[in-house]
């Protein structure tokens, strides 16, 4: 079974693994006060406690110029199970769970092939949310087992298996979000997302709050007095925004504004901005970058009778299912 190197933690200071305190030292690191060199491995296959996580497989801690790096060496199928419980509701349809299992497995192999120095994936939502043992729900175990080894391929290689919570009715293409076209990641209409809590959302900001959020980006506008949505992408997402403030004006793209305000606050770039008495109201739909499979859209398809193969074919046209061992 393929193994993955999952970055669990990076810290400038001490970290705790299995009840042992590991501390950076001048010549490497120390465990419980004893020098052990630049690399230390936990004994056994776990589960090991690493900060808030309990993980299977091996754990290694390496001294880096910035402190300590904790990496979990875990089997691909165990990794898939541990992500599913963090990505989907446990009571969702079995076919949705299986579609997500294939995507989690495919994304992991895609990232592994990129050859990052020291690890394959991060454990947070910049890659996939990895829950360790706590993510291993019964539904996750079943979906992993029933799709064991299956991945999506395009021209014989694992695809960029992108997904998001909900699309707001239409997915985005890879070209409009990441600036490069991907044949199997085009925009498509999505039905059945009405049950998503993010079908319609709104959030308020004062002009002062907006101005402060932009300061780290180098846009020192003071109190924001006007927000103008400029260009939109083909799927309707905000591409550019102009902001006027008491200390100047600035322009940035919609994704940068979303990140500055919090990607779980402004849940997507499919929004419009309205003025209010004390500032601005962002009114939008969907949650996430919008590329690839909508999880809520997949769940709607499953409830209507689609199996996981049909779900994946709908969201990733031109790809094929195969077993990783066959590659």
What do the PLM-derived regions correspond to, one by one?
Residues 1-327:
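Conserved, single-site charged/polar hotspot
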């Amino acid at each position: 079974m393929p193994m993955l190197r999952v970055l669990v933690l990076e810290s400038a200071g001490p970290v705790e693994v299995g009840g042992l305190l590991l501390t950076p030292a001048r010549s490497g690191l120390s465990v419980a006060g004893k020098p052990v060199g630049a690399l230390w491995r936990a004994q056994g296959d776990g589960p090991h406690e690493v900060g808030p996580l309990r993980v299977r497989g091996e754990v290694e801690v390496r001294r880096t110029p910035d402190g300590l790096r904790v990496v979990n060496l875990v089997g691909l199928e165990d990794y898939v199970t541990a992500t599913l419980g963090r990505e989907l509701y446990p009571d969702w349809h079995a076919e949705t769970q299986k579609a997500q299992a294939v995507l989690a497995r495919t994304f992991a192999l895609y990232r592994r092939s990129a050859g990052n120095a020291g690890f394959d994936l991060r454990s947070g939502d910049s890659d996939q949310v990895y829950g360790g043992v706590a993510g291993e729900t019964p539904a996750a175990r079943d979906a992993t087992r029933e799709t064991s080894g299956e991945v999506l391929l395009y021209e014989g290689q694992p695809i960029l298996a992108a997904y998001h919570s909900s699309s707001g009715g239409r997915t985005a293409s890879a070209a409009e979000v990441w600036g490069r076209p991907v044949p199997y990641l085009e925009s498509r209409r999505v039905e059945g997302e009405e049950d998503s809590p993010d079908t319609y959302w709104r959030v308020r900001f004062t002009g002062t709050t907006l101005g402060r959020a932009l300061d780290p980006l180098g846009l020192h506008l003071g109190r924001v007095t006007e927000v103008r949505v400029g260009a939109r992408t083909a799927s309707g997402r905000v591409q550019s925004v102009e902001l006027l403030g008491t200390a100047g004006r600035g322009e940035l793209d919609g994704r940068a504004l979303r990140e500055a305000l919090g990607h779980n606050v402004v849940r997507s770039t499919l929004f419009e901005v309205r003025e209010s008495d004390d500032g601005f109201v962002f009114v939008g739909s969907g949650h996430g970058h919008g590329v690839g499979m909508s999880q809520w859209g997949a769940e709607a398809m499953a409830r209507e009778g689609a199996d996981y193969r049909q779900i994946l074919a709908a969201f990733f046209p031109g790809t094929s299912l195969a077993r990783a061992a066959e590659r």
